[in-house]
Amino acid sequence: MKNVLRRMSLAALIFGLLLSFSMPESGKAAFWDTKGDNFIHDPSIIKEGNIWYTFGTGLGTGLRVIKSTDGRNWSAAPSIFPTPLSWWKMYVPNHEPHQWAPDISYYNGRYWLYYSVSSFGSNTSAIGLASTDRISSGQWRDDGLVIRSTSGDQFNAIDPDLVVDKDGNPWLSFGSFWSGIKLTRLDKNTMKPTGSLYSIASRPNNGGAVEAPNITYKDGYYYLFVSFDSCCKGVNSTYKIAYGRSTSITGPYYDKSGKNMMNGGGTILDSGNDRWKGPGHQDVLNNSILVRHAYDALDNGVSKLLINDLYWDSQGWPTY
């Protein structure tokens, strides 16, 4: 991943403070004011050439894609797999006609898109994979099943996130409720699991309400971002973003207070505000951009794309 070093002059600092007053909904100069067709749920973002792409949960017409030339003004792009693939019903018989929570990454010269097939409230689920040489081509190869879960499992195979460790090895984190967040190493060629599942976060005393993992590596630490509590209830959503870190990709991950994330630990990064309710299902790009959805209280609770610049304090913890 590419890290961004910021050196802010006094003039830039003053400008930033002035700018912050023009953005009362976020209170931060780092807030990207997204407009246009910015409806999204469970976003994952990437930039190909001069075009930003954000992928999200689809509502019956394939995985949703929106694009932008500046990261602020968004328009719809063609969806992915608008016609259901035949193998989805094999593993998830009660699959509803939409796909959830995609994750887009670039690795070894190819774009990899992991996504979820499930039904609400069930852990009979599957994670699928699609790939392409160029997002702009609109041509995606179906790479099939990655991992599945059934009602007899204590985990839920949804909310995938690809991460590459400091040695260049790909891993997949995933999970939602049940016993929490899992991690497995991937084969560099097939981009599918090679063996063990590691448990890296859970909330045993909070109804299991942890999901949507995202891992990034920076300055000797792996940072695990997760979403706590409940999404999908519009302005009544209680979603919030929490995090911890570890010197090993397989954990243990600890929050700022030293609590293990396997025991419900997690320092809150974003719990929303008067306008933006239930922020979550976050994605971190290049250690410098924080993306998530939130429900707009000024627009009937519609789920929209939120983007902030992401910073790191003197102790190496994320902030925005």
Predicted regions and their residues:
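Carbohydrate-active catalytic/glycan-binding domains of CAZyme proteins
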Residues: 27-320
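Bacterial N-terminal signal peptides
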Residues: 9-20
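Cleavable N-terminal signal peptides
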Residues: 15-16, 25-27
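Positively charged n-region of N-terminal signal peptides that target proteins for export
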Residues: 1-7
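Short, intrinsically disordered, low-complexity terminal segments
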Residues: 8-9, 26
